[in-house]
Amino acid sequence: MSRVLETLEPKAVFHFFEDLTRIPHGSRNTKAISDYCVAFAKERGLWVYQDALNNVIIKKPATAGYEAAPAVILQGHLDMVAEKTPESPIDFTKDALDLRVEGDYVSANGTTLGGDDGIAVAMALAVLDSSEIAHPALEVVFTVDEEIGMEGAQGLDFSQLSARRMLNVDSEDEGIFTVSCAGGASANVSIGLTSAPCALACARLTVSGLIGGHSGQEIDRGRANANLLLGRVLNAVQCKISFRLVSAAGGLKDNAIPNAAEAVLALREEDMPAAREIAAACEADFRKEYAAADPGVTVALEPAPACDQALTEEATLRVVRFLLLVPNGIAAMSMDIPGLVQTSCNLGIFHVTDSVLTAVSSVRSSVSSQKQMLLARIDALSQLLGGSLHVTGAYPAWEYRRESPLRDKLAAVYTQQTGKTPKIEAIHAGLECGLFAGQLPGLDCVSFGPDLVDIHTTREKMSISSVQRTWRFLLGALEALKD
């Protein structure tokens, strides 16, 4: 098979990148690419470790003059998001990608490219392969299944690592240094409720037309949470009309801002017009409040089929109080990085069925103690309402370091090479760096990478010139880490 990237510079980087594109390596299909990395290390006499998950660690001694320098972790992930167009003939279990070079970009015909994070692996292999690149002792870590929940990093044996400085090459915008990320957890609330026979009329209350979005990346857009709006309407109705709740539901994922929610109410037939007026008044309020962020919000109350069971009024009150009091939205902004959401909570899933209230909130914070504070508040509310909290899916924060020698050194290298100051950023979502920081006390870490466009889609492409500049930066960074 002829090589498509052989004329591109840096030759070693693009050589290894093309090798990787010939090995199927979608998430949960990483054995072959993991074995490739192990064979690479053994052929060069390097120390190598491979675990049952297919994570790989390769160690290389320091070059001359760097023997006394602290070791450095160079990290990326082996898996890619495997997506293709309907007409693509590629079989991701056995076929190589069909690479294309157009102008300044490398892409794959009809499929994702896997630049996220194949370019990190290719750069690390090129460093390991070279006898000319100056560097401290290296601990190269290739994790797996990052794209489906960072499963490889979650199961990594961190006792194999001694370094406390780390270069993560898993960012998609050149010139941006990511230096912090949120930790998170899912807060699962369960509250038992009491039902009783019911002979009242029923109405269906719906809140819809919202935009929704990702609860980490878009929590700062000011968009409404349908579950919270549902609670406000129920409270407004309850203040003037006696009703009993039959059921309620809103949201499908805890990490998505719900764009719709509904509830079935049991009430007297003669109260139906007044309840409809209250719903209309709430809609008017919401449209005013969210005119800029969520202008499509609608609230409707329509007749529904009769039911023979409903929550008691006391149980209904507990549900309404939960929706009014549960933490939601931005809890704190960062004092270190302007514009960064530091702590937030999103009630992504809410159900009342079979006399049980079930709610799942996504809790995020780049400060571990604040994440615990929010979980404690949800726990306290749950207990006050006769329920319980179960925390799942917890992952650690990568907390911002006000003093970071590594960040300072890398910024100096970047400025020296480009004449520009790197942009320092943090994200309100989880990264593998957070798992490393949680397991390696004192870790000083920076994430960077070349320009990748439309990752995780069949339009994905990687800038050749940006790879060249990022490679030059990586070499300069390794050279600068002499102390």
What do these predicted regions represent?
Residues 13, 335, 342-357, 362, ...:
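Zn-dependent metallopeptidase/amidohydrolase metal-coordination segment
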Residues 159, 223-240, 269-274, 318-324, ...:
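His/Asp/Glu-rich mid-to-C-terminal helical/loop segments that flank catalytic regions of hydrolases
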Residues 18-22, 264, 298-310, 348-350, ...:
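A short beta-alpha structural unit
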Residues 136-226, 234, 238:
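Fold-level recognition of mixed alpha/beta catalytic cores in primary-metabolism enzymes, strongest
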